[in-house]
Amino acid sequence: MKTEKININNIPAMVWGEKKSKVFIAVHGNMSNKEDKVIQILAEKAANEGYQVLSFDLPEHGERKNDTTYLCKVQNCVKDLKQIMEYAKENYNYKEINLWACSMGAYFSLLAYKDENIKRSLFLSPVVAMKVIIDNMMLWSNTSEEELREKQEIKTDFGTTLYWDYYEFVKNNPITNWNKETYILYGSKDNMQEEKLIKDFCNKFNCKLSVLENGEHFFHTDEQLEFYKNWLDIIK
């Protein structure tokens, strides 16, 4: 498949496939990158159906992994997602823009693209309630909201750093609007987001949910990837 590496306002990105009038913007998840296996599979399927794919590295991921001056915080990620969208509109003149997002990439997309004209959204193992995840990490690390506000950042024993500005942004920007045709693939053994939260999100925003029994948050086994490939048949 034809691929082209480009740079969008210092964001490393990749265009997959020949020039088309339709595109999927692909937003990867934590500890992933713009060339991840699930994005490769998406690009192959999308190309066969007449779409290009535009993927990019989130802060501190992929080609940006060693840049510690611009952290993978929600504010920065939302800013980057908006820049990618504007670039796609201005430079490629797509007639149709679609979205694929995984894990925390889905959460950033819900914030950045809520007012965008997106034809269809595909979410793999999405994070739809980031506050719940941060609240849990604060509980596990015995960190109170007051302590985090006072110290601004706290490094936990399990390796994650909690940031007050990140938490405050999440609290002040709840997901209240997502009026797009959306399909979600979720593993029943996802340890990042409870199934009830996913189902509540689907009911609230009329999303179509597919569940892989015994599937994990990280789709990586042959069985999981085969199920994922078949799920992508919704791309037409």
Which residues fall in each region the model found?
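Short beta-strand element of the alpha/beta-hydrolase
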Residues: 21-29
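The serine-hydrolase catalytic nucleophile loop
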Residues: 31-43, 196
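Gly/Ala-rich beta-loop-alpha elbow adjacent to hydrolase catalytic centers
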Residues: 100-109
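Short beta-to-alpha linker loops that shape the active-site pocket of alpha/beta-hydrolase fold enzymes
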Residues: 30, 57-64, 127, 215
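Conserved alpha/beta-hydrolase
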Residues: 38-39, 43-66
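The alpha/beta-hydrolase serine catalytic core
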Residues: 72, 107, 117-200, 204-211, ...
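N-terminal cap/lid segment of alpha/beta-hydrolase-fold proteins
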Residues: 1-19
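Catalytic nucleophile-loop/oxyanion-hole region of alpha/beta-hydrolase
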Residues: 62-92
